[in-house]
Structure formats: C-alpha cells, structure tokens
Amino acid sequence: MTERPALIRKWACIMTVFLFCFVLATRGRAQNQAGSISGTLMDSAGSVLKGAQVSIPAKGLNVSTDEQGRFFFSGLQPGNYTISVSYIGFENLTKTVIVNPGESTAVSLQLQVGSEKQSVLVTAGSASAEVEAVNEERTADNLIQVMPTQTITSLPDRNLGDAISRMASVALTRNEGQANFVALRGGEPRLTNTTVDGFNMPSQDPGIREFDFFSVPPGIVGSVTVSKTLSANKDGDGIGGSIDLVTKTASDTPTYQITAMGGISAMGGFTPIENARPNADIYGTWGRRFGASKKLGFVVGAQYSFDGTGYNDVEPTPDEATLANNQSVPWDDAQDLRTYMFHRPRYGVGGSLDYRIKPGSTIFLRYFYSFTRDSGDKSVYTLFDNTPGAQVINPGNTGCSGTDATTGATAPPCNTPPRYYNQAEDARIYSDSIQLSGTHVLNNTWYSWSAAIGAGYFGDNPFESGNFTNTASTTACQFNQAATKDYYVPQWTPACFSEINSPQNYFFTGTQREPGHEEQINLGLEGSGAFRWHLGGHLSTFEYGGKFRGMHKYNNQYKSNETYAGAGAGIPMTTFRNNLVQPNYYNGAYKDGYNVWFGPVQEYVDQHPTEFTLDNSDKGVDSSNYSLVEHIPAGYVMNTTDFSNGIRLVLGLRAEVTSVNVHNLAFDPNGNATPNKFSGSYYDLLPSASLRFNAGHDSYMRLIYARGVSRPEESELASDVNWGTGGNGAYKNTVSFGNPNLKAETGDDVDVLYEHYFKTFGVFSGGYFFKHLASPPVQTNTVLNNYLPPGAPSIDQGTYLATNYINAGSAWISGVELQYLQHWTNLPGFLSGLGMNANYSYIGSQTSGIAGRSDKPRLLENAPNLFNIGPTYNKGPLSMQMNINYNGSSIYYYQYTDGAPGGPTGPLGDNYNYPHTQVDAQGSYALPRGFKVLVSGLNLTNEEFGFYYGSPKFDTQREFYHPTYSFGLSWTPQHEK
C-alpha cells in the first residue's frame, strides 16, 4: 500500500519542476521585450523548401527550415538583422530585416535556382525531392538519409520496405515476394528501430520487436528519414540505425494529387500461373490551410493497392551422398512442390492536423494507419526419396524407415509415398498511431512535448491447414541423381508424379486452425526544452528532456483441430475438384499434382459437423500465450556549440531504465499448465558526441561516436516454462524458459564521413563506420542446482539442465559506405536531363559465443556487398527513373556446429539467403492541366528468392515472382510538385 503514495509523490515532484521551469520561462519573456523573426522559404514555383540553412551571421544563430518551409529566430534585441539563406541547387540569399520591441517580424523569402540549366530540378518531382533530401541531410547533426514521398513513388514498390532498400547500406528480409524487415549497416533487423514522427512503432509480428513493413503502402508518408547514428535526444534503440516515418504536413499552398495504376504480373520464366495476375494501385494527397492567417492546416495521404501474386516454389531437403565409387554428390532426401496464389489488399492513411498559435508555437495532431490482409492459398506435395543403399550424412529425412542413423546407409522398408496438405493464409496485419505534440519557442528558450499511442496487430485465422493421408501401400518414388544436371532443378523418377496425380489414393482427414491474435500496444509521453548560452564567447544550446515509454504485448492464439471421426480413412480427395491445373509447372521441370484449396475442405467440415471431432482444449493454455509489460523511463542532456570556421560540436548523455514484467505458463511433463510470472530490470547510460567542420570549399567532415541498445525479443523474455523429469544421460531433469533478466545488447559506433557538394547539383560522400556489440542474447545450456519448476511438487526439486537465453559473447561490424548523386545539367542539349543516384557498401562482421561452435561467423543478415545504381532522366515533360538493387548473400539463421558432417559448406551448414539483384523502372510524361501518364516495371529481372545450406548446391528453396507491368494516370495541379 506504500507504493501508490510514493508514486504520487514522485510524479508530483516532476510536475512541480516542469511548472517551475515554465513559470521562469514565461516570466523572463514578460520582462524582456525582445523581438523575433518568423519566415517561410519557397522556390520560384511557390513550393516550400525544407531543410534550408538560415542564419543571422552577426549573432551566430543557425536554424533549418521545417517540413513547412518555416523558420523562427527568437530573443532578438530591437534593430536591423541580416538573414542569410543557403540551399544547395539555388542561389544564396541575404535580406535585411527590422526587428521591433516585443514584436515578431514576418518575412517571406523566395530562392532562385543556381542557373537556368538547373531549373529542371524544380520542375521534375523526383529531382526536386532529391534537392530537398540533400539539403536536409546537410544540415543535420547526425548522419541521416532522407527519402521524400516524391522519391518513394518515383519507382514501383509493393510496400514501403522496397523503397527504403534503395538507400545506402540497407538490406531486406523478404518473405513470399514481399519486403518484411529492414536491416541497416550489416546488423540484423532486430538492431533496427522504427518510429513514426519519433514515436516507437509497435511490432505487428508474434514474439519479436521488429516493425514489419509488409503492411505499409509506400505513398502514405511524407518522407522517410534513416538515422545511421544516434544522438542523446533520440531513443537509444537502434544499434544498426533508426527509421523514422514522417507523416505529411500541410503547406501554405493547397495540395491535391492523385495517381491510379493498374496492370498485370506476367508469369514468364519459371512460374507460368494462369498466364497473368492482376494488380492495382491508387494513392493521393489532399491538404490545405484555412483562414486568412492560415493558422489551421490539414493534410491526408491515402493509398489502396491490390497485389495478385502467384508462383511455384520448389523446396528440396538437401543432403550429401557417397556413391559406390566413393564419389560424394549432392542428394535430396525429400522435396516440396508448392503453389501459392495470393490476393492481398493493402491500404493506409497518414497525415496531420496542425494549428499555429503564433510564430514559433505550433500544435500537431498526427495520425498513421496501415492494413494488409495477407490472404491466399497454398497447395503442397512432398516427395520422399525411397532409394535403398544410399550413404547419406543426414539420414533422418529419407523415405527409408530402416535407415541406420549412425552409418547413414538407407535401408528398407523404403515405402513413404508422397504427402499432401493445403493451407489458407488469412492474417489481418495492421499498425497505427496517433500523436499530439507541440513546439513552443520563447525568447532564449524553447520547449516541446508529445503524447502518443499506437498498436500493432497480427492474427484472426492466420494459418488454416487441411490434412490428407496417402493410403497407397507401395511407392516407387525416388530422387534421380543421375538425371539431375542442374542442382537448382533436382530430378525425381516418373513414379513420383504419377503418384501425386492419383487423387484416389488421398483422403482428407481434418483441419488445423490457429484462431486468436498477437497485439502490441505502445504508449509514449515526452517533454524537452533548451536554452541558449555562451561557452567562452561561442553560442551554445543546452537541451534537456525526459520520456516515458510503455509497452504491452500479449498472445491469445490457440489450436483448433477438427479430425475426421467417420468410417474409412477419410473423405476421398476426388470429392473436391482440382482447383488449379498447371501444365507447365516450374517452367516444365515437373508435372504438377491434383490441387485442392483449403476453402472447399473447410466448407465440407462446416456442412458435415457430425463426421469430425473438435479439439480446442488448449484455448487459454497454449504454449504461445504470454503477456509482457515493459516500462522505459529516460532522460537526457545535450549541448551544441558553434565555433568559428564552421566547427560544430555536439555532446550528449542519455540514461534509460528498463523494467519487464512477464506472465506466461509453465507446463509439466504431462502437458498440464500452471500460471507463472516473473520480472527483471536494468539501466543503460548512452553517451554520444558529434564533430562537424569545413574541409574545403563546399566540403565537410563529420566525426561521430554514439552508443545504442537493442532490447531482447519478447520470445526470449517470455517463452513458456517447459520441464520434464524423465530424461536419459547425465541430466534426468530438463527445463526451458524465457529469461526476464536478459539485458539490452549494447553497441558502440564510430563514424567518419567526408561529403562534397558539386556546383551543378550533386553530392559525393564517403565514410567508414565501426560498431562493437557487447552481450547479445545467446541461447545456451546451464545447470541449475536445487531448482523447482513453477507449479511442480517439492519432490521434483533438484538439478536441472536449463535451456534459455543469456547475455554472452560479442560481435563487431565494420563497413565502408559510398554515395554519389548528381544531375548533369551542364551537359549540352538533351543530355542535360541525365542524372545518377548510386551507392555502394562493403560491410564485414564477426560474432562469437554461439553454442556448439568455435568459429566466428558473420552476423545474421549481414550481406557484405550492397549497391544501388539509379540512372535518371528529367527534361521537359519526360521523367524516367531506373534502379538496380543488389543484396549479397547473407546468413539467415545459424545451423552449423563443430564437427558436423560435410563441414560449414555442407548440407548441415548455416542457412543462407541467395544474393538478390532486382531491376525496377518507371517513366512519366507530363500532359496539359497537370496530368501525367505513367508506366512502370517491377522486378524486370524476375529475380530469384530462396535459401541454401552451406553452399548454393545445397539448395533448400528457390522461387520466382515474375515482372509486374503497370500503367496509370496521375493528376497534380501545376503549382504543386
């Protein structure tokens, strides 16, 4: 009972301090009749310019224009002041402004392009967006990359993750043809933090923290900012980096824009399915400001798309066999022949409502919502190798049940016929947030605040499967190594395909469903302030702030199985029609089987309930169920000092305290569940420093150090307790559980960057970074003495071999990053429309502490080579963009252990992503009255997706998603860009 009064006293003290600071600030303002300057910066076309550097050199004051092109100087004594404006691609501007006592002087400034040849940059949407991005990157204190909405939509994308992958040092985790998670600078996706307007977005996926870009349409955000280094006024999450999705804000000029696209996915290459699949995409923005003084602004961006994807997927179970002549050859113990047919709607909305109370004081209400229904059908046949006498190194997967597990020699009975199941994916996936915030600039101080809430959701009936049994008493299905000329297309005997085309042998035996959902709810409250002061005669800004973050994630999914209980083996497959006939399956490499979608079998179950027995006994006591609550209060201080000769030094320190409370279940050897709960806490101190200085004309150097954290996954903290007492060997008692005492992994980052800006618009930057990662979560086995599992009788207390995650080991990441962007407007004639946007990264890494191995492999998802080559053309009414995106091979998950047969490059090696090279292109032609016609091509190279073990010859999955061609029309009033 003493905790509640203590908590009230603590918050009362905090509120008293904030109130005291506010009273002092307002009192100082009343006593000091200083004036201010507020302004808006635009180009000659009337569009606002974001990220411009605006200064009053005589006072040493420097600010950047915000997303509305606005700037504000406060605390100015009455008099004349010369304002200087710098914006790459435009002529510099100076203007003298008179400041009167206690008044705010409003100015509207207009910049002219640097030369007539550069006028293309303000008439082409994607090119002008690049100008905006470069200027914003130049004025930032930390290393950022910015991608405005015009750049995002200048190339075709299925979701926002595809667009982000075109930035430097960005790799994607893909699934079923879609971008899911983003990995920055050689780190795993779990080292990447994602926010919307600075608010930490909850994950939509079960058991992890990573934000899934699968559900986010690309056209609903105003821009994407990737912060590759951290500062004290940002959350400490993000050792790899942080991605901020910035919602749109209303400008002084009304905004109206709409684009509609439609087309087909051409099923060429390896996966001809129904000749073509449809796609559709429509997105737009509407916004304006209201009233004579335009104090109230509103903008909304919305998008709807439909993705019809269909493909064939071959998934072998690779092995290595020794032939009679002692030759070792790749071998397949089994192989899936899969067909996917998806119909995925995706839509979203994002924007803001803002009110300008007065110059320098604005309140925002920002909102973001994205939704995808991951809906589709899957049909799967599994072939088993029934070859006796083969000498394999991984014998557990063959069709020969008499195989000796020690010698690996396959032996009779070899009688496992092909199996079949179908599945419907129907997951609802969404994320949303709403944020109320404000920024208020006083004479020599400013303060800001925000309150936000958001949710991430995955579930309903994400996976529903229909089970079939094959009643054939014999089989002649075997892997045909002699006929396999290409290990990407393993060959099997003709009997295999005769057997999967014998529906009379297959019987439907029931369904498996997973109702329920997993949801994460995030809450954020933040306040910060700053004041100007002088350090040895140099103007400085001291900033301070505090933040509280709360997270609640829970899972209530369960299994619902309906099993056939009637006479006979089941319902004959021939009861259901063949839903898809594919005469050219996988480009003719295989003969397809009889395909039954899940919908008809579920309909049969619903219509004949007496023939099936329902079992959902684990509802409420499923091993996946848990509830996790996490609280993170944080505070920071940061000081920025501007010295002479363009030297700028930023020093900061952030402190974060993390507390975790977990409710889950403990299961005894009989599967009986007992409620369980536990908690843990820790703190982190996160220093940061940034130095920027001139390195020649239009050249700069940056030196940055920062420490970040990556908190453990929810599954590592909250997985169920599972124990047993009937084991063999040294430890009779075993237990596995989540570890709430896990602490955050820390990462120390050092960056060195050189950047040079060209006279004709462009920039080159080259840098080196090094990250040292300490205490990552590692799964291990430990011995617990006198341990009593939760809910166990006292007689079971004793010594247990425990499997769980602990903080152990270390890792490092090191890389070189190069970027080049230029528009060659100085070239003669039609060549002046040419441009290039390219980047390249080489990233190495090494980790240690992995259980069962002494080597030091690369980090997961670390692709050593990444590059983008993006030629552009913008001249007159014609605008064209192309991008070649390359992600090198990377480890998807660790499998290899010391001494495994075949070594690290064999079939028991780590699981790797294939390298990925994708070409996308889009062109537009401007018509009168603001209309444009567009044509685009996505994945023009029909690039493969898949995995392999150890080396590519041990292929385990390989699928193709086909080019997608789209045509459309866009309309934007001519005063908009």
Question: Which positions does each model-derived feature cover?
Answer:
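Periplasm-facing N-terminal accessory domains of Gram-negative outer-membrane beta-barrel systems
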Residues: 13, 17-20, 24-130, 140
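Periplasmic N-terminal accessory/gating domains of Gram-negative outer-membrane beta-barrel systems
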Residues: 91, 98-107, 119-183, 188-190, ...
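A beta-strand signature from Gram-negative outer-membrane beta-barrel systems
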Residues: 167-168, 203, 208, 215-259, ...
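Short loop/turn motifs that connect adjacent beta-strands in outer-membrane beta-barrel proteins
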Residues: 250-255, 290-296, 359-360, 439, ...
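Transmembrane beta-barrel wall of Gram-negative outer-membrane proteins
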Residues: 274-387, 401, 419, 426-436, ...
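Outer-membrane beta-barrel signature, preferentially recognizing the C-terminal barrel domain
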Residues: 416-433, 620, 624-632, 680, ...
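C-terminal beta-signal and adjacent terminal beta-strands/loops
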Residues: 566, 886-900, 913, 924-977
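Gram-negative outer-membrane beta-barrel transporters
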Residues: 769-773, 777, 784, 788-896
